[in-house]
Amino acid sequence: MAVVVNKENVDRFIELSKVENLEAVVVAEVTDTERLRMYWRGKEIVNLKRSFLDTNGARQITNVEVKLPGEYPLAVGDINVKEEWINNLKKLNVASQKGLVERFDSTIGGGTVLMPYGGKDAATEQEAMVAKIPVLNGESKEATIMSYGFNPDLGVWSPYHMAYYSIIEAVTKLAAVGGDYRKVRLTLQEYFEKLGKNPERWGKPFAALLGAYQAQMDLGIPAIGGKDSMSGSFGSLDVPPTLVAFAVGVEKAKNIISAELKEVASKLVFLMAERNEDYTLKVEGYKKNLEKLHELILEGKVISASSVKFGGVAEILSKMAFGNKIGVKFSNLTKEELFGLNYGSLVLEVKSDVNVDEEFKGCAYKAIGYTVEDEVIVCEEYDLDLKLNALEEAYEEKLSKVFKIKTTDKNQTVKEVLYNESNIKSPVIKVAKPKVIIPVFPGTNCEYDCERAFRNAVAETETLVFRNYSNDAFVESIKNLEKQIRESQIIMLPGGFSAGDEPDGSGKFISTVFRNERIKDAVMDLLKNRDGLMLGICNGFQALIKLGLVPYGEIVDIEEDMATLTYNEINRHMSSIIQTKVVSKKSPWFSGVELGDIHNVAISHGEGRFVAPEKLLKQLIENGQVATQYVDNKGNIALDMPFNPNGSMLGIEGITSPDGRVLGKMGHSERIGDNLYKNVPGNFDQKIFESGVRYFK
């Protein structure tokens, strides 16, 4: 990163960088010579006038030939609706991408308003990425919305319409979650074949530019950023004309809605974007639709919405139904509406007591049916009676071999064992506001979330960036960490990827630091002599395991027969919301919940599978050291995906030391807050942080 700093502040800036474990050096100076001079090994190699650079190079001229698009090639013919419904879900641009999406941490920062897939079964694809604006203190109420739009088939037919509808699709998606299209700003990313001097090739980005411009003028919203890539050719291969539109907006987090169907007996409405003869939208009607939609979302009358995309209304009805397994009975839709491209149109779930004709008066719409309790999609007109499970299998099939979403079921059950004894005595010395030390190692990325969680629990927090850019910095960090541990009552090891999870396994860097004699002595003094607590989440749990603090309560040498956390059974990173059950009350960290309570918790890890010898597992169960286990939607201990995200033995998610005061767990209990995960039903607050603080009072 290049930063311009006032010359009086250079030394201060470099010192502040060192505090953050960053190297900063002066690489250039701003002068009044109006020339750019660059040196290599003391020799001047560049000397250019600023006025020359300001010209942005020589002016270039080319000929452009725009070909008119031919007959619209994407019309729906005479098809068998039942067969097409299933085949439609198998299309590459319709099929589930869940196995790909789960590879990316969707809850980092603790501000996620909508998970990528919603509903109790996490199966309904969402319209947009929505996250609260991050703040260091307090609770943010504002959320950002980001959506995208692009259809490659349209690009092959007409670059003009492709760019036009990329913007329409992105804006419609943003409106579907509760955003106001009038406040949208756009950024565009283009990608075209190598143009050379061919006028027809130049005509493709030119036409796309005109289409994008028309959409912006029609909607009154500008693109304020973008990126171009003009290298989409390799040998005889060319990319299709591509302009991907990204729409960005803001809205109160409380106003955001999601795509999965919510209630039985809701009304379903098809809000239609009508087209002109040239295949552009009748824009005034489209804008009126979006304004009405925004109004009804704010009034709580529209409770879910999804824009029509590549696979038409048939795609949307299926996907909206998957998340909560709520069925649909529909009618009054043509084959073109079911399977054709109807960008700008939406399917809405409307509360059962809403007068649809009155609310949508003046809009282009159809009342198309209602939701039902049975897990089916039914239409008498087309003799349809499709089971949601069968449709979901078709939806997941296309990419399942490339991006796996399941492992082989073990077909085993685990007997639930609840441990209700507690041997925790309150500390001899009470503390009104206990201090929490949160060391931040290279690769740690959850310190802000953990600090916020403890502050909300009314604790004093101190973050310490562990610096390793030099030997002196390393030694100083050891001394500072020791000092902070001795002044604190709680040690918090947050999640992340310490030292990039290398070499060969996560948490090794943290465990190496904590094996330093000064740190080791301070930790054991805290735990054994001062009745302190320690918590490790995700990467922090991995470090606790490697140290032996869980399950042994001591920093010990690693032996082959010890417990460990290893690679997820699916052999990739997993990010999702799972459910865990509290099965032991031994730890003070769980004093605020009841035995058997089930909570939702965010997980994001590649090495979270708990494994241990059978003898040790038996001891942990008997001693009440197994604190939490993964469970399914019925509350049963889960051994298989998706409920057990990593394949942990006995479904173990969290364990404690023998006395319960050291807790390690994979789930990110700190990633909670108001209006988060609005599309995933359940209780997210395990009260871990307030329980830890209350222990000292």
Across the structure, where does each feature detected by a protein language model lie?
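Glycine/proline-enriched, intrinsically flexible loops and inter-domain linkers
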Residues: M1-G500, V513-M524, L650, I655-T656, ...
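Short acidic/polar capping segments at secondary-structure boundaries
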Residues: E8-N9, D32, R275, D353, ...
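Short glycine-/acidic-enriched loop or helix-start segments at secondary-structure transitions
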Residues: F13, Y448, E502-D504, L544-L547, ...
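Amide-donor transfer/coupling interface in amidating biosynthetic enzymes
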Residues: F474-E476, L481, M524-D525, D557-K697
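Cysteine-nucleophile active-site neighborhood
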Residues: S498-K586
